[in-house]
Structure formats: C-alpha cells, structure tokens
Amino acid sequence: MNTDVRIEKDFLGEKEIPKDAYYGVQTIRATENFPITGYRIHPELIKSLGIVKKSAALANMEVGLLDKEVGQYIVKAADEVIEGKWNDQFIVDPIQGGAGTSINMNANEVIANRALELMGEEKGNYSKISPNSHVNMSQSTNDAFPTATHIAVLSLLNQLIETTKYMQQEFMKKADEFAGVIKMGRTHLQDAVPILLGQEFEAYARVIARDIERIANTRNNLYDINMGATAVGTGLNADPEYISIVTEHLAKFSGHPLRSAQHLVDATQNTDCYTEVSSALKVCMINMSKIANDLRLMASGPRAGLSEIVLPARQPGSSIMPGKVNPVMPEVMNQVAFQVFGNDLTITSASEAGQFELNVMEPVLFFNLIQSISIMTNVFKSFTENCLKGIKANEERMKEYVEKSIGIITAINPHVGYETAAKLAREAYLTGESIRELCIKYGVLTEEQLNEILNPYEMTHPGIAGRK
C-alpha cells in the first residue's frame, strides 16, 4: 500500500491524492480534465475566494445553520488562504469547463482539509468537515465564484488606477519640463505647424486622465454581487437573513463597498459589468499604444531618423549591430496593448455566449480580464520608471526642423493670401530656399514683418502671428 497517498472518493469513483495535499478528489479530476494553459489561479482571486468562504461561514453560523466549532475552523483555514499561505495548493487551470466549479471546489477542499487538520483530524475525513456541506454551505459556484471575481477585479483595478495616476502625473511633469521646447507638429506624418513639446506631453497626460476616470467608473457595477443567488439566481438553499449578513461580511473583509444586487437572477445571468471593464481597459491601451508610437517615432534615429527626443537606453538592441539601442519600453507598451485588444475580444465572445440563467464561459472571461488588468499595471509601472522619467528633449534638432520647415508658411497665409503662400511653399520645396528668403526675394513681406510673423513660439497658441 502506498503510504504517500490517501484515497478520496466522489460519486464517480476513487482517486489517489498526495497525502500532504490539501486539495482533494475534485481538484485532481480538474487537473486531469483541464491541462490547458499551464497557468495557475491568480493570487488575488485565491485571496478573494478565501474572503468569500470566510464570510459565508460566519454568516451561516450567525443564522444558526453551521455548527460553531466547525465554522470557526473553517474561518481559521480561510484566513490562512487569505494570507496566501496555501497558494501552492490551488492547482487547477484557470480555463476550464463547468463555469468555475473546479476553482470553487479547489477552494472548498483546501479550506476543508486545512480546517480538519486544525481540528486534529485527518485530511479527507469529510464526515467531520465537508467541502460541500460545510465550506460551500448556502452557496453555489454560480454565486461564490463570480463574487470572488468581483472582489479580485476591484482590488486589481484599484492597483491599476493608482499606477496609472502615477504615470499620468509623470507625463504632466514632462509637459512642464518641455513647456518651452519648440518643435514641428505633424499631421499625416508630414510637417504641419510648430507646436511645443510640452503641449504634446500635456495632451498625453490629459487623455490618460480620461482613461483613469473611465476605468474608475466601471467599479460601480462591480459593487453589485450575487452572493446568495445560489444556482440560478432564485436563492434556493440560502436563508434570506444569510444573504444580508454575508454581504456585510464581504464588504468588511474585502474593503470594497459591496452590495447585494437588486435582482439576483439578472446578476447571475449577465456579465456586462465585466465587458464594461474590459472596454475601458481597451480604450486606455488604444491611447497608450498611440502614445508609444509617437515616442518611438520622435526617438527614431539617432542619425538618420527624427531624433527629437532621447529615450533612456535600457539594453543593447542587437546581436549583430554593435552599439544599437532600441526603444524597448514603448515597444512593450504596444505589445501589451495588442494582448489587451485580444483579451477584450475573448471577453466579448465569452460574455455573448451565456445561455438562460448562467454564463458557463466565465472562467475564460475572468482569466482574460484579470490578465489584462495585471499586465497593464505591470507595464505602466515599468514604463514610467524605465522610460518616461528619463526622456530628454533634443532641442537643437527640433529647432532646426522648425527653421527648415515649409510648414511655417501657414503663418504667412493670412498676410499674403492662400494662392501666394502656396506658390512660395512650392518654390521653397523645389529649390531648397527658405520661406523667409523667398518672401524677401519677391518683396512679399519686410524683414521686420517676417521677424514677427515667423516667430515659431507665436504659432503655438491661438491668434494670427504678426497681427497686434
């Protein structure tokens, strides 16, 4: 007989479980059925599952459904899960069939077996403390798993919001630093009219501020939880008093202003609150990818590109070209954006795929949503510290572009008319002569007038340059 294992059984039969393991037979079945991604459950979701199980045990004790001795051991075991002590025991793949039953049962089994151990009983002695009858009392996967995900997503969103605020503030600092730096504005990747580098960076900061607000606003619908809905939202096997009490405990232990959804069937059927979050994340990454593209273009060179800004050198850029340095931080921002776009499509498809009283595709939906939030938080932290803070302006190069640009003819347009200005611009392009030289050559404007009109700083705010 193998003494390194214990035997657990369910209505499908028996399974060998490693003797030291806190998970049980249903977790083992899940690992056999779903070796899909190679990933484990996110630590924040494990913590949230602990909060759900602790809150449920306390509420069930308060309404007289759960034996107090059993309940106290469940609470102690759940506290250890919340602390992250047993993260290594959560071994199921996050993408799975069954609407999250395997994740829920992984939590139930770990908490039950640890509670048994604390009680002085052998793991697997479910006649004393059962994963289903005790740890999962008054619950279904269909309310426990989404509620845990709401808590995890809210916690991760708060981290993302703080990180994004920090990045936004650093963009504003750069806007102030570059407030007097003149450069050429571009439309269609062609020279347009002068702009201040600080104006560009402030525009970046402002769009990020809107993203912060958009993301923050999505939290409101996540505060509505369906705990107590049980299987289909009707609350079967959940005492009405339990629903109220468990919601209070969940709000207390999670630190979020959670409330019971007004209509539990609606809250169990529908997943629009997650697609709303994902949409806000996608919009944010659309904006961040655009900013990353701008930075890569401005930093192109250093000799044969724009070379308007200098990004911090983070690592050698080529295994064959000595001395080459690449814009790796904007590049990783682009790649995170692409991942978030793909995740959003998955979330959209999964959200649409629900039928009747439950969306069974929630595991892939939650996996992608949590991944999007996590990788955005990570990339914003790294980008801010390793790139944004160290960006330098190549002021001489930008000034040279402005002075050589034909785009400044736009400022002359109100003084000489569009047709004359267009002829001057065309000749400047063909001959290489400057706009200033051609204006003097043809007597279109005087030197004094040109000094006022062609002051590039006068072109960076509303008004007609040279008109007092």
Curated annotation (Swiss-Prot):
Changing residue 324 to A: Loss of activity. Does not result in any major conformational changes. Changing residue 141 to K: 40000-fold decrease in catalytic efficiency. Keywords: Lyase. Changing residue 320 to A: 50-fold decrease in catalytic efficiency. Aspartase is mainly used in the synthesis of L-aspartate, which is used in the pharmaceutical industry, parental nutrition, food additives, and is one of the principal ingredients for the manufacture of aspartame, a low-calorie sweetener. Aspartase from Bacillus sp. YM55-1 has several characteristics ideal for application in industrial processes: high specific activity, relatively high thermostability and no cofactor dependence. Changing residue 141 to V/R: Loss of activity. One of its GO terms (cellular component) is cytosol. Changing residue 142 to A: Loss of activity. Does not result in any major conformational changes. Changing residue 322 to A: Almost no change in catalytic efficiency. SUPFAM superfamilies: L-aspartase-like. Unlike E.coli aspartase, the enzyme is not activated by the presence of divalent metal ions at alkaline pH. Changing residue 101 to A: 7100-fold decrease in catalytic efficiency. Does not result in any major conformational changes. L-aspartate binds at residues 101, 140-142, 187-188, 319, 324. It catalyses: L-aspartate = fumarate + NH4(+). Changing residue 324 to D/H/R/S/V: Loss of activity. Optimum pH is 8.5 at 30 degrees Celsius and 7.5 at 60 degrees Celsius. Free AspB is very stable between pH 6 and 9, keeping over 80% of activity after 24 hours, and much less stable at pH 5 and 10. Residues 317-326 are annotated as: SS loop. It comes from the Bacteria. Optimum temperature is 65 degrees Celsius at pH 7.5. Thermostable. Retains 80% of its activity after a 60 minutes incubation at 55 degrees Celsius. InterPro entries: ApsA, Aspartate_Ammonia-Lyase, Fumarase/histidase_N, Fumarase_C_C, Fumarate_lyase_CS, Fumarate_lyase_fam, Fumarate_lyase_N, L-Aspartase-like. GO terms for molecular function: aspartate ammonia-lyase activity. Homotetramer. Each subunit is composed of three domains: the N-terminal large domain, the central helix domain and the C-terminal small domain. Substrate binding induces a large conformational change in the SS loop from an open conformation to one that closes over the active site. The C-terminal domain is essential for activity. The small C-terminal domain could play an important role in controlling the conformation of the SS loop and, therefore, in regulating the catalytic activity. Belongs to the class-II fumarase/aspartase family. Aspartase subfamily. This is Aspartate ammonia-lyase. It comes from Bacillus sp.
